[in-house]
Amino acid sequence: MSHSVEDIKSESRRLRGSLEQSLADAVTGALREDDQTLIKYHGSYQQDDRDIRDERRRQKLEPAYQFMIRTRTPGGVITPTQWLALDGIATRYANHSLRITTRQAFQFHGVIKRELKATMQAINATLIDTLAACGDVNRNVQVAANPLLSQAHATLYADAARVSEHLLPNTRAYYEIWLDEERVSGSGSEDEPIYGERYLPRKFKIGFAAPPLNDVDVFANDLGFIAILRDGQLLGYNVSIGGGMGASHGDAETWPRVANVIGFVTREQLLDIATAVVTTQRDFGNRAVRKRARFKYTIDDHGLDTIVAEIARRAGFALQPAQPFAFDHNGDRYGWVEGEDGLWHLTLSLPAGRIADTDTAAHLSGLRAIAQLNVGEFRMTPNQNLVIAGVLASERARVDALVAHYGLDAGNQSATALARGAMACVALPTCGLAMAEAERYLPDFGAALQPLLQQHGLAETPIVLRLSGCPNGCSRPYLAEIALVGKAPGRYNLMLGGDRRGQRLNTLYRENITEPEILAALEPLLARYAAERDHANDEGFGDFLHRAGVIALPPYPTHRRLDLELLA
């Protein structure tokens, strides 16, 4: 018997449910229905291989159930030793691949139920956990990708890690179920001062950005912290609230939203403001209609002023006026970059964040070889790429040799500008929500679009491209200059008009169309862009479409654009 998510949470004994009984049931590869909800809070989703679902049904077999496990790695920072251990876990328990997510976490795919506990224990043995990586809690905290670049970046990362730890659930269920922690008096009734017995109405996302780079797409987060730097010193943070990408096709009651900047806080006020925002959403969020439960809808339903006043009341102080800041782009900086301390940082382009050995590339083996050098650290970016950080100048040649040998940076060195700025969610065959391909389709669509770009002299012009297999928007498609949002197998909504800074939503241009129709719609627009764009100001494709009147932001019940003139 299925129950509402709210009932499942409140009756779960702090996220325990019957997970242990489900895991012990050898008759099926699945969990009990309610436990499929609860395991998300432990960092895992039950999935099945949709490529073979119909065949298994014909054979009267249950679906090929498997589990995705997601790490909690604030800012995506791990050591070479941890990398090697995670590589081993992917090879032993998962599908021989690692995947970098758009929130700087790792995902393991293809873990079967009888090996789920052993996999969880192996991950925790690396001093990485998966607690609260999924579910109606604060998820993995994003951070500007390279905290070693300067002391201010390092402080930013430390602050993000503090927020991540502060917002972890108090329940010991995770440690009891996966790590065999001994149960003590009060087990199942732990106090959850931030979350309460029902946790949050929906998932909650936090990002820390360091201008002028908006690699975290901070305005897509429920709560954003924008570092205010003066003369290299971190003074504090502008606070943004109410971003979110998810929507439902054809449902006027759901929409993506760009966050509002509501003021400035000092570093000392960081945990207080985070707690105030999260608990405001806990108490004001819509628990009756799950599709309307994200913080963005709470703000739109109650009004921004009401929510900001409530946050200030709970924090015990009013936010100061927002400080000036400006972003110039939301991509990654590829190649070697030198930090303030003389250490070097190499950003590698990894298409869709997938790290595997295939017929055309040996990314898993190559990164294993770099990790075995034991130099620097590994830092995942919010654009699904990877930074080899903190490398001595004397060690660069060794890293470069391995990069060349394994073809690790093909995405940067030989691929197109389009590929370097592209992202895609996993979608088929594992995501249960996917309506169309995304990760597996990205290379093919890029190859189909590239001749049009070359035809119009745009082959090396950066264009932000994102593919999503469904309207939930895990790849943050609604901020892209060009986005394909899956509608059905082989059919997509074509969204146009985001910008390179992550500050403006795109809008629907064509609905439910196939690849030939997508290319036919884009060709005349690319031709006009090539002929009429403002070269002097490096005008982006999305900005041009707005200036030329090709598209416009329609009347909309929510926040769609951050006004650039306020941020200079």
Curated annotation (Swiss-Prot):
It is an enzyme of class 1 (oxidoreductase). Binds 1 siroheme per subunit. It comes from the Bacteria. GO terms for biological process: cysteine biosynthetic process; hydrogen sulfide biosynthetic process; sulfate assimilation. SUPFAM superfamilies: Nitrite and sulphite reductase 4Fe-4S domain-like (SSF56014), Nitrite/Sulfite reductase N-terminal domain-like (SSF55124). GO terms for molecular function: 4 iron, 4 sulfur cluster binding; heme binding; metal ion binding; NADP binding; sulfite reductase (ferredoxin) activity; sulfite reductase (NADPH) activity. Its cofactor is siroheme; [4Fe-4S] cluster. InterPro entries: CysI, NiRdtase/SiRdtase_haem-b_fer, Nit/Sulf_reduc_fer-like_dom_sf, NO2/SO3_Rdtase_4Fe4S_dom, NO2/SO3_Rdtase_4Fe4S_prot, NO2/SO3_Rdtase_4Fe4S_sf, NO2/SO3_Rdtase_FeS/sirohaem_BS. Gene3D superfamilies: Sulfite Reductase Hemoprotein, domain 1. GO terms for cellular component: sulfite reductase complex (NADPH). [4Fe-4S] cluster binds at C425, C431, C470, C474. It catalyses: hydrogen sulfide + 3 NADP(+) + 3 H2O = sulfite + 3 NADPH + 4 H(+). NCBIfam families: CysI, PRK13504.1. Belongs to the nitrite and sulfite reductase 4Fe-4S domain family. HAMAP family: CysI. This is Sulfite reductase [NADPH] hemoprotein beta-component. The gene is cysI.
